[in-house]
Amino acid sequence: MPKIKTVRGAAKRFKKTGAGGFKRKHANLRHILTKKATKRKRHLRPKGMVSKNDLGLVVACLPYA
């Protein structure tokens, strides 16, 4: 049986946690930052978790994670 290919874009975006979830970076922190409040940018800084609704898609993209 052939190996399953990992989606390389997903491998760069998600990291698996010990509990089986996936960490991800928040959106809206790349450009046009001057009009965004400091508090908003600060809250976007820490990693978020992939929601349970999207978990199946991420797992399918990362078969060996």
From Swiss-Prot:
GO terms for cellular component: cytosolic large ribosomal subunit. Gene3D superfamilies: 4.10.410.60. It holds the Pfam family Ribosomal_L35p. The keyword Zinc-finger does not apply. GO terms for molecular function: structural constituent of ribosome. It comes from the Bacteria. InterPro entries: Ribosomal_bL35, Ribosomal_bL35-like, Ribosomal_bL35_CS, Ribosomal_bL35_sf. GO terms for biological process: translation. Keywords: Ribonucleoprotein, Ribosomal protein. Belongs to the bacterial ribosomal protein bL35 family. HAMAP family: Ribosomal_bL35 (MF_00514). NCBIfam families: rpmI_bact (TIGR00001). This is Large ribosomal subunit protein bL35.
